Amino acid sequence: MDTQSSIGNEEWRIAGTSVVSGMALGKVFFLGTSPLHVRELTLPQEEVEHEIHRYYKALNRSKSDIVALEQEVTGQQGLQEVSSILQAHLEIMKDPLLTEEVVNTIRKDRKNAEYVFSSVMGKIEESLTAVRGMPSVVDRVQDIHDISNRVIGHLCCQHKSSLGESDQNLIIFSEELTPSEVASANSAYIRGFVSLVGAATSHTAIVSRAKSIPYLANISEELWNIAKRYNGKLVLIDGYRGELIFNPKPATLQSCYKKELSVVAHTSQRLVRKSLHPIVSSHAGSDKDVEDLLENFPQTSIGLFRSEFLAVILGRLPTLREQVDLYEKLARFPGDSPSVLRLFDFGEDKPCPGIKNKKERSIRWLLDYSVILEDQLQAIAKASLQGSIKVLIPGVSDVSEIIEVKKKWETIQTRFPKGHKVSWGTMIEFPSAVWMIEEILPECDFLSIGTNDLVQYTLGISRESALPKHLNVTLPPAVIRMIHHVLQAAKQNQVPVSICGEAAGQLSLTPLFIGLGVQELSVAMPVINRLRNHIALLELNSCLEITEALLQAKTCSEVEELLNRNNKITS
């Protein structure tokens, strides 16, 4: 189609990648993305101390911004990970070495604060960018970039438009979106996001998904520039097909919404065979999440409680009493199966407040800090007096790690009265765990496959990186076969398996999980009803057929083609 002739009031469609699925309608709004203009100025000696004062003032205002935003997101369901990111921003801004370098450079070179700060942060960004292949490097680069823009914005009195102040339905277009921007968005009016680049496992996507805001990314620059001419016009995000539809016709709107409407209308008419459809459970990460789930979905189990978020919310490690109080609520939760409590999952991009250790993560981090692990196990032992709990060990790469944790548990539980059953499970997130699954299974009562990390470590990418075009699919063939391998072994050992991560809530993959025999899908609370309704529309034979085809796929493009074709058949 000739894009030039499409500009005006005619309907125009462009393709992107659906990062967060769903439908969204609103006016196009391009968020200001022009880089802040930083001039280099040489100051008279008598103005140097005033310039340093100006820097401190901008830095303190930036800290206040982050503290205010953190307080805002702390109480919101599903946004604890954002709080962790904001804590990392604060830690960087509080770093005395950073402040010392900026202040000393202003004094020594007599340059203006914004120029010096921009130069210092630029060097840090360059050093991080040079380290290729390390997980989460892109996350850190984005953090540095975000902090730099915030401080320089205060110095230059320039700021992006606030996403919390809109009073009309908008689809936000931005070359690059940060998690803090998405977290601050007023979801009553910000209906969708579109960016030049983006990945389904990025922090930005996780926040957008938690807020149930559809998100489309990876638009070509040529089409992006043409889309700017539609600023203020109506646009529809079709997150199921990965399309942007500018000036949608009434017939298009009716057709696009038909899928979601039909889900509600036909839920009671078609059911997957009993015992063959997966249980849908919910993520949680705070006391408020548990209360919200109890209020809205009292019979829904907690499929993944991220215990480290308690430390993030408090800004410190929780006391034994604080842990016991929270874990007792999990033990008493009236879901249809016991709550799953993941042990502290610190390290790398999720630092523990007050402890700097970036060498290890997950269970290896915990074993390095055995006192912290033993305190958590004591809290679990006390909470088990109130009810059954499932304990999930994160980031296992070798069976010896499971054995060591369980040995500590055996010692600790003898100090307390015998409580209800405590089951033990393992997160399958690393390829090493997949290929040692036969050795891991005898130590486990259940398994949980973390698709985000499994994809990341299998393909050798970071969470924030946009996948190369030939790999741009939520589950590449290698990971599909890994999941199949784990499920086959688990079935032989009669060990149930759940899926958590971005893939669990992606409706196009639900037939695959049913066909593979997944027993549980753990998703964010806003996705629960949509996923259950979708499952109710699926036929078992069709699920088995698409699963067989996907297991034979050799490339990501084949996977995408099969999923798109199946999506059209079932829609």
UniProtKB/Swiss-Prot annotation:
| Domain of life from the UniProt record | Bacteria
Q: Where are the transmembrane segments?
A: none
Q: Which residues bind Mg(2+)?
A: E429, D453
User: Which GO terms fall under biological process for this protein?
Assistant: phosphoenolpyruvate-dependent sugar phosphotransferase system
> What cofactors are annotated for this protein?
Mg(2+)
User: Can you name one GO molecular function term for this protein?
Assistant: metal ion binding
Binding of phosphoenolpyruvate occurs at R306, R342, N452, D453, R463
Q: Where is the protein found, in the record's own terms?
A: Cytoplasm
Q: Which Gene3D superfamilies does the protein's record reference? A: Phosphoenolpyruvate-binding domains, Phosphohistidine domain, PtsI, HPr-binding domain
The protein's annotated catalytic reaction(s) are: L-histidyl-[protein] + phosphoenolpyruvate = N(pros)-phospho-L-histidyl-[protein] + pyruvate
Q: Where is the active site?
A: H203 (tele-phosphohistidine intermediate), C500 (proton donor)
Main location per UniProt?
cytoplasm
Q: Which InterPro entries match?
A: PEP-util_enz_mobile_dom, PEP-utilizing_PTS_enzyme, PEP_util_AS, PEP_util_C, PEP_util_CS, Phosphohistidine_dom_sf, PTS_EI-like, PTS_EIN
Q: Name one GO cellular component term.
A: cytoplasm
Keyword flag NADP: no
Q: Which UniProt keywords apply?
A: Cytoplasm, Kinase, Magnesium, Metal-binding, Phosphotransferase system, Sugar transport, Transferase, Transport
| Subunit field text | Homodimer.
The record's domain comment reads: The N-terminal domain contains the HPr binding site, the central domain the pyrophosphate/phosphate carrier histidine, and the C-terminal domain the pyruvate binding site.
The record's annotation in NCBIfam families points to: PTS_I_fam
What additional remark is attached to this entry? The reaction takes place in three steps, mediated by a phosphocarrier histidine residue located on the surface of the central domain. The two first partial reactions are catalyzed at an active site located on the N-terminal domain, and the third partial reaction is catalyzed at an active site located on the C-terminal domain. For catalytic turnover, the central domain swivels from the concave surface of the N-terminal domain to that of the C-terminal domain.
What is the stated purpose of this protein? Answer: General (non sugar-specific) component of the phosphoenolpyruvate-dependent sugar phosphotransferase system (sugar PTS). This major carbohydrate active-transport system catalyzes the phosphorylation of incoming sugar substrates concomitantly with their translocation across the cell membrane. Enzyme I transfers the phosphoryl group from phosphoenolpyruvate (PEP) to the phosphoryl carrier protein (HPr).
The name of this protein is Phosphoenolpyruvate-protein phosphotransferase
Native organism taxonomy: Bacteria, Pseudomonadati, Chlamydiota, Chlamydiia, Chlamydiales
